[in-house]
Curated annotation (Swiss-Prot):
Disulfide bonds: none annotated. GO terms for cellular component: chromatin; mRNA cleavage and polyadenylation specificity factor complex. Residues 1-31 are annotated as: Disordered. Component of the cleavage and polyadenylation factor (CPF) complex. Belongs to the SSU72 phosphatase family. It comes from Neurospora crassa (strain ATCC 24698 / 74-OR23-1A / CBS 708.71 / DSM 1257 / FGSC 987). This is RNA polymerase II subunit A C-terminal domain phosphatase ssu-72. The keyword Nucleus applies.
């Protein structure tokens, strides 16, 4: 897998499944009602996680996104000359302007400027998963797309876009020691690291979100909104038990996007 979470070459030949044509291709009217809270994760919080973040927000889901790398790494003029930035300190807009000043032809041709242009419309800058203060109010992120509903700083489902990111998230959650005792589903969808596959992956993520949200709403109605929304283990058990079946059905619709799942704890 690419060590850089941005486009690194020609797109793969895999095509989206026929079932993706279900209204998952952009903004849509909000049908109202309950919405699960999502978090998307990749290495640098640039390409795949941001495509997922944008699409989930357009589908009216509360969503945040992160990267798991030590630094933000973007392709440079050669493989030995990447552009490197710090998480939480560098805005997408400043990265855009820096690369545009360095070599506009190169960074327009390889898709970085287009990607960064999208990202700066979604939120301020790349955030690192390991620095996320889970359960703390996200008061500085009210202008991010998908921020409504994420004010409490917790998610119901974390979707990673690469196995190493899934491993990093699971390891970090174990190290934190589950202080909130709140269940969270961590799902990895293996999305190849280029623009085309990120776009396909984004649609697949929304398809999965819709399926998960449907069963969550059903279980919430059974146990009561207050109990379910509290995130307590007992109130969420019905939903938790149904997730593997939903994921198996989703996998049949998206056979080119291998998925892995586990139940973890905040």
């Amino acid at each position: 897998m690419s060590a850089v979470d941005t486009p690194t070459g020609a797109a793969s030949s895999s095509k989206p499944d026929q079932n993706e044509q279900n209204g998952q291709n952009g903004g849509r009217e909000d049908s109202g009602g309950f919405k699960l809270k999502f978090c998307t994760v990749c290495a640098s919080n640039q390409n795949r996680s941001m495509e997922g973040h944008l699409r989930l927000s357009l589908a009216n889901y509360p969503v945040i996104s992160f990267g798991t790398g030590s630094l933000v790494r973007l392709p440079g003029p050669s493989i030995t000359q990447p552009n490197v930035y710090k998480f939480n300190e560098t805005s997408y807009d400043s990265i855009y302007r820096e690369l545009e000043a360095k070599d506009p032809r190169l960074y327009r041709a390889n898709g970085l400027l287009n990607m960064l242009g999208r990202n700066r419309q979604v939120k301020w800058g790349p955030e690192r998963w390991q620095d996320w203060q889970i359960g703390m109010p996200r008061t500085k992120h009210k202008d991010d797309k998908g921020a409504d509903g994420m004010e409490g700083g917790v998610a119901d489902v974390v979707i990673t876009c690469e196995e190493r990111c899934w491993d990093a998230v699971i390891e970090d959650l174990l190290n934190r020691g589950s202080p909130l005792n709140r269940p969270v589903h961590v799902i990895n969808i293996d999305i190849k690291d280029n623009h085309e596959e990120a776009s396909v992956g984004g649609r697949a993520i929304v398809d999965l979100a819709d399926s998960l949200n449907k069963i969550a709403a059903e279980e919430r109605e059974k146990v009561g909104a207050s109990a379910f929304d509290s995130g307590s283990v007992g109130a969420r058990s019905g939903f938790d038990e149904r997730v593997p079946d939903v994921l198996a059905e989703w996998q049949e619709r998206w056979p080119n996007l291998p998925a892995t799942w586990t139940l973890a704890w905040f």
